[in-house]
Protein backbone atom coordinates (compact mmCIF):
# COMPACT_ATOMS: atom_id res chain seq x y z
CA UNK A 1 0.00 0.00 0.00
CA UNK A 2 1.29 3.42 -1.00
CA UNK A 3 1.39 5.76 2.01
CA UNK A 4 0.14 9.29 1.41
CA UNK A 5 1.92 12.46 2.56
CA UNK A 6 -1.04 13.57 4.68
CA UNK A 7 -2.84 12.34 7.76
CA UNK A 8 -6.25 13.01 9.32
CA UNK A 9 -6.37 12.85 13.14
CA UNK A 10 -9.95 12.91 14.44
CA UNK A 11 -10.77 14.76 17.69
CA UNK A 12 -7.10 15.21 18.56
CA UNK A 13 -7.79 18.28 20.71
CA UNK A 14 -10.95 17.91 22.75
CA UNK A 15 -11.57 21.60 23.51
CA UNK A 16 -14.31 24.01 22.43
CA UNK A 17 -12.24 27.10 21.59
CA UNK A 18 -14.02 28.70 18.63
CA UNK A 19 -15.38 31.83 20.40
CA UNK A 20 -12.20 32.34 22.41
CA UNK A 21 -10.02 32.09 19.29
CA UNK A 22 -12.08 34.50 17.17
CA UNK A 23 -12.14 37.04 20.02
CA UNK A 24 -8.41 36.71 20.67
CA UNK A 25 -7.19 36.59 17.04
CA UNK A 26 -9.53 39.14 15.41
CA UNK A 27 -9.19 37.81 11.83
CA UNK A 28 -10.15 40.13 8.97
CA UNK A 29 -11.26 39.90 5.34
CA UNK A 30 -8.85 41.65 2.98
CA UNK A 31 -8.64 42.37 -0.73
CA UNK A 32 -6.71 39.95 -2.93
CA UNK A 33 -5.26 40.40 -6.40
CA UNK A 34 -6.96 38.29 -9.07
CA UNK A 35 -4.50 35.99 -10.88
CA UNK A 36 -3.37 37.43 -14.24
CA UNK A 37 -5.02 40.78 -13.47
CA UNK A 38 -4.62 43.87 -11.34
CA UNK A 39 -8.22 43.61 -10.12
CA UNK A 40 -8.78 43.33 -6.36
CA UNK A 41 -11.61 41.28 -4.85
CA UNK A 42 -12.58 40.49 -1.24
CA UNK A 43 -11.06 37.28 0.06
CA UNK A 44 -13.57 34.43 0.54
CA UNK A 45 -12.58 34.06 4.20
CA UNK A 46 -11.03 36.10 7.00
CA UNK A 47 -7.35 35.61 7.78
CA UNK A 48 -4.64 36.35 10.35
CA UNK A 49 -0.90 35.64 10.65
CA UNK A 50 0.93 34.90 13.91
CA UNK A 51 4.59 33.98 14.20
CA UNK A 52 7.66 33.79 16.43
CA UNK A 53 9.73 35.06 13.49
CA UNK A 54 10.01 38.46 11.83
CA UNK A 55 8.73 37.01 8.54
CA UNK A 56 5.60 38.38 6.84
CA UNK A 57 3.12 36.10 5.08
CA UNK A 58 2.57 37.02 1.43
CA UNK A 59 0.17 35.57 -1.12
CA UNK A 60 -2.28 36.74 -3.79
CA UNK A 61 -1.04 40.32 -3.67
CA UNK A 62 -1.47 40.80 0.07
CA UNK A 63 1.06 40.96 2.88
CA UNK A 64 0.36 40.15 6.52
CA UNK A 65 2.92 41.58 8.93
CA UNK A 66 4.29 39.35 11.71
CA UNK A 67 2.18 39.36 14.89
CA UNK A 68 3.21 37.37 18.02
CA UNK A 69 1.22 34.28 19.01
CA UNK A 70 -1.81 34.98 21.18
CA UNK A 71 -2.01 32.81 24.34
CA UNK A 72 -4.55 30.28 23.02
CA UNK A 73 -2.81 29.88 19.65
CA UNK A 74 0.51 29.37 21.47
CA UNK A 75 -1.07 26.70 23.70
CA UNK A 76 -2.44 24.93 20.59
CA UNK A 77 0.97 25.13 18.91
CA UNK A 78 2.51 23.26 21.86
CA UNK A 79 -0.26 20.61 21.82
CA UNK A 80 0.13 20.02 18.08
CA UNK A 81 3.91 19.80 18.36
CA UNK A 82 3.41 17.06 20.97
CA UNK A 83 0.95 15.15 18.79
CA UNK A 84 2.83 15.51 15.47
CA UNK A 85 6.42 15.50 16.76
CA UNK A 86 7.42 18.55 14.70
CA UNK A 87 8.17 22.10 15.85
CA UNK A 88 6.30 25.05 14.32
CA UNK A 89 6.98 28.78 14.57
CA UNK A 90 4.11 30.33 12.61
CA UNK A 91 0.36 30.06 12.07
CA UNK A 92 -1.74 31.13 9.10
CA UNK A 93 -5.31 31.37 10.38
CA UNK A 94 -8.52 31.12 8.35
CA UNK A 95 -12.00 32.07 9.58
CA UNK A 96 -14.91 30.72 7.54
CA UNK A 97 -18.00 32.65 8.69
CA UNK A 98 -20.61 30.68 6.77
CA UNK A 99 -20.95 27.86 4.25
CA UNK A 100 -20.19 30.16 1.30
CA UNK A 101 -16.74 30.98 2.69
CA UNK A 102 -14.48 28.46 0.99
CA UNK A 103 -11.17 27.94 -0.79
CA UNK A 104 -10.75 26.18 -4.14
CA UNK A 105 -8.17 23.50 -4.89
CA UNK A 106 -4.66 24.83 -4.36
CA UNK A 107 -1.26 23.95 -2.95
CA UNK A 108 0.34 25.92 -0.13
CA UNK A 109 3.43 28.05 -0.61
CA UNK A 110 3.75 29.82 2.76
CA UNK A 111 6.17 27.87 4.95
CA UNK A 112 6.65 25.15 2.34
CA UNK A 113 10.12 24.27 1.22
CA UNK A 114 11.83 24.77 4.56
CA UNK A 115 10.25 21.80 6.27
CA UNK A 116 7.17 20.93 4.22
CA UNK A 117 5.15 20.34 7.39
CA UNK A 118 1.73 21.99 7.80
CA UNK A 119 -0.61 20.93 10.59
CA UNK A 120 -4.09 22.46 10.61
CA UNK A 121 -6.56 22.23 13.48
CA UNK A 122 -10.27 23.09 13.20
CA UNK A 123 -12.60 24.64 15.79
CA UNK A 124 -16.29 25.36 15.38
CA UNK A 125 -18.52 23.84 12.71
CA UNK A 126 -17.46 21.03 10.38
CA UNK A 127 -16.32 21.63 6.81
CA UNK A 128 -15.38 19.25 4.01
CA UNK A 129 -11.71 19.21 3.02
CA UNK A 130 -11.02 17.75 -0.42
CA UNK A 131 -7.60 16.39 -1.39
CA UNK A 132 -6.91 15.83 -5.11
CA UNK A 133 -4.00 13.90 -6.65
CA UNK A 134 -2.32 16.05 -9.32
CA UNK A 135 -1.59 13.09 -11.64
CA UNK A 136 -4.73 10.97 -11.37
CA UNK A 137 -7.28 13.62 -10.25
CA UNK A 138 -8.43 11.04 -7.67
CA UNK A 139 -10.10 12.80 -4.73
CA UNK A 140 -10.44 11.98 -1.06
CA UNK A 141 -12.72 13.88 1.32
CA UNK A 142 -12.49 14.52 5.06
CA UNK A 143 -15.18 16.05 7.26
CA UNK A 144 -13.05 18.27 9.52
CA UNK A 145 -14.82 18.84 12.82
CA UNK A 146 -14.03 20.55 16.12
CA UNK A 147 -10.57 19.53 17.36
CA UNK A 148 -9.61 17.55 14.23
CA UNK A 149 -6.10 17.86 12.79
CA UNK A 150 -5.15 17.54 9.12
CA UNK A 151 -1.37 17.15 8.75
CA UNK A 152 0.44 17.54 5.40
CA UNK A 153 4.12 16.65 5.04
CA UNK A 154 6.91 15.51 2.69
CA UNK A 155 5.92 16.15 -0.95
CA UNK A 156 2.21 16.70 -0.30
CA UNK A 157 2.21 20.21 -1.81
CA UNK A 158 3.83 18.89 -5.01
CA UNK A 159 1.65 15.80 -5.50
CA UNK A 160 -1.72 17.01 -4.17
CA UNK A 161 -3.96 20.05 -4.03
CA UNK A 162 -6.50 20.61 -1.28
CA UNK A 163 -9.67 22.68 -0.85
CA UNK A 164 -12.22 23.72 1.75
CA UNK A 165 -15.45 23.12 -0.12
CA UNK A 166 -18.51 25.34 -0.03
CA UNK A 167 -21.06 23.83 2.36
CA UNK A 168 -24.37 22.55 1.03
CA UNK A 169 -25.97 22.83 4.49
CA UNK A 170 -28.43 25.70 4.96
CA UNK A 171 -26.78 27.16 8.10
CA UNK A 172 -23.50 25.31 8.70
CA UNK A 173 -22.12 27.72 11.30
CA UNK A 174 -18.67 29.31 11.48
CA UNK A 175 -15.29 27.55 11.56
CA UNK A 176 -11.75 28.65 12.33
CA UNK A 177 -8.69 26.74 11.11
CA UNK A 178 -5.20 27.35 12.45
CA UNK A 179 -2.51 26.02 10.11
CA UNK A 180 0.85 25.75 11.84
CA UNK A 181 3.90 26.15 9.62
CA UNK A 182 7.71 26.29 9.66
CA UNK A 183 9.18 29.60 8.55
CA UNK A 184 12.40 29.96 10.56
CA UNK A 185 15.65 28.01 10.14
CA UNK A 186 16.09 26.42 13.58
CA UNK A 187 13.26 23.94 14.08
CA UNK A 188 13.51 20.24 14.84
CA UNK A 189 11.35 17.45 13.49
CA UNK A 190 10.95 13.70 13.90
CA UNK A 191 11.46 11.77 10.67
Swiss-Prot record:
One of the GO biological process terms: DNA alkylation repair
A GO term for molecular function: dioxygenase activity
Record domain Fe2OG dioxygenase: where: 87-184
Name assigned to this protein: Uncharacterized protein R406
Amino acid sequence: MDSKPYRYISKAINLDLYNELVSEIKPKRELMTVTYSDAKIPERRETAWQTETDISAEYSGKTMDPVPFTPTVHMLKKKIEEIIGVEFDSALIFHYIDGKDSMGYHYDTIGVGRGNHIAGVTFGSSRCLGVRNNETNEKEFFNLGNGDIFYMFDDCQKKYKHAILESKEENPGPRIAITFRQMGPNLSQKN
